[in-house]
C-alpha cells in the first residue's frame, strides 16, 4: 500500500457498524472472565490487554500505523521521543556495555548516552557522521552492543550514511538504531537501507501541531538475535521475571525486541503514551504526507534565501547543492528532507540574538517541526549542557540559529526573515 494511503487508513480497519475514527480506549484496566484468562496474559501466552501502563488498544492501533509506514514488523508507542530512544538502547545494553553513536545527535540524546547511561555503567564512543569506514570500525569495542544515529541530525542537519553505519554495525554483530524523526517515513525509510530499529519523536512532524508529546519504536524484524546470543543475553536467555521465557525463541526475530521492551521496560519504567495523546497523534498522521511536502518546500525556499544573504555566514540544509551532505540527501532523501534549516549569522551570537528578537512570525521556542514557524539558539537552549568541545563536535557553534519552517506562506516567512536581518 502507498504510504499516502497508510497515513490516512493504516493501523485500523473498522468492521460493520464500528467507529470510522479510531476509538479512544480511556481505561486503565480490562475485564476478564477468569483468573486463568488473565494469567495467560501475564505469562505472555495470549494476546490482549490487562493494564494500560504496558499496552492500550488505542496506542497499539497508532503504533501499527507507524510500523506500516516504516515497513517494520512490530512497534510500540512511548510517552516521548526521549523515552523511545532510551528504551531502544537500554533494551540491548546493560552495565559494562558500550555504544557507538554519531557525534551530531540531538543534545538531549547526547546527554542521555554520555551522562545518564554512563551512570548505569554503559559507555559510548561518538564518531563524526562523515568519518571513514576505517575510523568507524576503530570506534567499536568487544563490548559494543549497538550503533545509534539520526537520519537528519538535530540541529546540525548532518545526514547519516545509513548503509555505511549499518555495514559496520553488522560486521561487528550488532544492530543499527536510527532516529528518523526529521524526515519521517514519508521521506526516508531507514529499514530499506539496513537499519534494524527505528525510533521517532512523534511530538514533531507526526503530530505536526505542537499539541501532544510522544515517541515510537519500530523493529525491522531482520536482525537475528540468536545468531549473536552471546551479545544479547536479555533477548536470548531466560527472563526470570516471566517464568523463564526466552524472547528470541518465543517471539522470533520479528517480535522479540518489541515484546521485551514492552514486557520489561514499559512494565518497570511506565513511559506509556496516553490513549488521548495517541488519538490526537493519529489525527496528525492522517495529513503527514501532505504537510511534509509544504514543510520541505518552505525549508528549501528559506535556505536558498539565507544562502544568498550577505549577513548570513553559512546555511545547513542538505537540499542545497552547496551542502556537504547533498549527495547523501539525493540518495536517502530524494523526495525532500524536512522543514528545518540551521544557519550562522556573520555577526556571531549577538547578531543571532537580535535577529530572533526581531522576528514577527517565527516564535522563539524549544519546539521544532510543527505547523507554526519557530526558531532558537541551540547553544543556549537544547545543547546548553554541552561544553565548547562537545558543541564543536556536534556541529553547534554559538552563533547557530535553528529555524523550523512551518506551513505558512514562504513569501511571508522570507519577508519576516528579511526585515529581522535588516535590524542587525
Residue ranges and their predicted role:
Residues 34-86, 108-116:
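Conserved N-terminal alpha-helix of the aminotransferase class I/II PLP-enzyme fold
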Residues 47, 73, 277, 281, ...:
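Short amphipathic alpha-helical segments
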Residues 292, 300, 304-307, 311-401, ...:
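Conserved C-terminal alpha-helix-loop-beta "cap" of PLP-dependent enzymes
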Amino acid at each position: 500500500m502507498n504510504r499516502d494511503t497508510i497515513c490516512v487508513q493504516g493501523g485500523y480497519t473498522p468492521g460493520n457498524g464500528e467507529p470510522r475514527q479510531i476509538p479512544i480506549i480511556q481505561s486503565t484496566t480490562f475485564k476478564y472472565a477468569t483468573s486463568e484468562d488473565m494469567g495467560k496474559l501475564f505469562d505472555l501466552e495470549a494476546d490482549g490487554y490487562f493494564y494500560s501502563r504496558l499496552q492500550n488498544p488505542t496506542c497499539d492501533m497508532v503504533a501499527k500505523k507507524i510500523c506500516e509506514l516504516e515497513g517494520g514488523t512490530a512497534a510500540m508507542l512511548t510517552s516521548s521521543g526521549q523515552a523511545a530512544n532510551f528504551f531502544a538502547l537500554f533494551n540491548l545494553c546493560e552495565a559494562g556495555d558500550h555504544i557507538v553513536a554519531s557525534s551530531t545527535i540531538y543534545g538531549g540524546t547526547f546527554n542521555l548516552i554520555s551522562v545518564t547511561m554512563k551512570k548505569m555503567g554503559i559507555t559510548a564512543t561518538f564518531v563524526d557522521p562523515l568519518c571513514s569506514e576505517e575510523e568507524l570500525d576503530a570506534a567499536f569495542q568487544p563490548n559494543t552492543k549497538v550503533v545509534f544515529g539520526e537520519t537528519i541530525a538535530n540541529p546540525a542537519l548532518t545526514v547519516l550514511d545509513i548503509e555505511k553505519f549499518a555495514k559496520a554495525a553488522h560486521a561487528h554483530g550488532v544492530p543499527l538504531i536510527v532516529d528518523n524523526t526529521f524526515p519521517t517515513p514519508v521521506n526516508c525509510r531507514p529499514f530499506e537501507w539496513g537499519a534494524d530499529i527505528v525510533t521517532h519523536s512523534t511530538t514533531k512532524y507526526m503530530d505536526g501541531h505542537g499539541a501532544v508529546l510522544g515517541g515510537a519504536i519500530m523493529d525491522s524484524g531482520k536482525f537475528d538475535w540468536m545468531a549473536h546470543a552471546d551479545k544479547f543475553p536479555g533477548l536470548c536467555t531466560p527472563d526470570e521475571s516471566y517464568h523463564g521465557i526466552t524472547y528470541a525463541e518465543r517471539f522470533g526475530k520479528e517480535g522479540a525486541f518489541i515484546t521485551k521492551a514492552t514486557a520489561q521496560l514499559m512494565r518497570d519504567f511506565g513511559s506509556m503514551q496516553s490513549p488521548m495523546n495517541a488519538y490526537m497523534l493519529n489525527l496528525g498522521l492522517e495529513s503527514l504526507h501532505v504537510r511534509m511536502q509544504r514543510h520541505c518546500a518552505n525549508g528549501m525556499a528559506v535556505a536558498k534565501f539565507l544562502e544568498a544573504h550577505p549577513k548570513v555566514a553559512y546555511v545547513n540544509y542538505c537540499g542545497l547543492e552547496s551542502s556537504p551532505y547533498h549527495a547523501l540527501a539525493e540518495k536517502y532523501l530524494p523526495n525532500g528532507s524536512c522543514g528545518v534549516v540551521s544557519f550562522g549569522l556573520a555577526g556571531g551570537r549577538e547578531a543571532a540574538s537580535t535577529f530572533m528578537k526581531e522576528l514577527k512570525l517565527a516564535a522563539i521556542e524549544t519546539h521544532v517541526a510543527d505547523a507554526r514557524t519557530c526558531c532558537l539558539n541551540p547553544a543556549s537552549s537544547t545543547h546548553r549542557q554541552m561544553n565548547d568541545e562537545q558543541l564543536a563536535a556536534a556541529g553547534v557553534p554559538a552563533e547557530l540559529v535553528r529555524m523550523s519552517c512551518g506551513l505558512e506562506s514562504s513569501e511571508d516567512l522570507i519577508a519576516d526573515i528579511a526585515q529581522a536581518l535588516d535590524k542587525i
